[in-house]
């Protein structure tokens, strides 16, 4: 299952070790957005290089993908972007994916973005549409400095994670190692 990491403005980017653990658990691409940056792709080291340029005074949404729908390619990495509205998803949706699109991108294009465009990110109409789609998933949206999260996120060191399954991949010293 994918992982979303939301970094509020003023909070440091997770360590390389944490980023590598998220990648190892979800190796099918990664991406991030801030109000002034957007990058996604299949090359982890390039991702880290771009992320290092992040302005700590801006919020950031990162996503690490484990492919469940759609092929493994840059176009299927999150976040998805339409007119400076960014969307990342963690989970599986009951949405029939469009040809070679993920369930996430299909939901964003067909259902979520049209409501955001018409009513605004914080409208009751968007909230209702989200709750009609989300089931047990997690969503993250960004428009400029404005971030909106849906679903339960775990807080660790000031960052918010859609799940902590990736922590299994963090190298630890064995208590009896010498």
Language model features with spans:
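Short, surface-exposed beta-edge/turn micro-motifs
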Residues: 1-2, 28-30, 57-59, 77, ...
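Extreme N-terminus nucleophile/cap motif
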Residues: 1-51, 60, 152-178
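Fold-independent oxyanion-binding glycine-rich loops
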Residues: 7-10, 63-66, 90, 105, ...
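A short catalytic or substrate-binding loop motif that flags glycine-/basic-rich loops and adjacent residues
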Residues: 23-28, 71-72, 131-134
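PP2C/PPM family metal-dependent serine/threonine protein phosphatase catalytic domain
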Residues: 57-76, 166-170
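Acidic loop->beta-strand submotif enriched in PP2C/PPM serine/threonine phosphatases
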Residues: 68-86, 129
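Conserved beta-strand-loop-short alpha-helix elements that form
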Residues: 84-97
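Short histidine
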Residues: 94-151
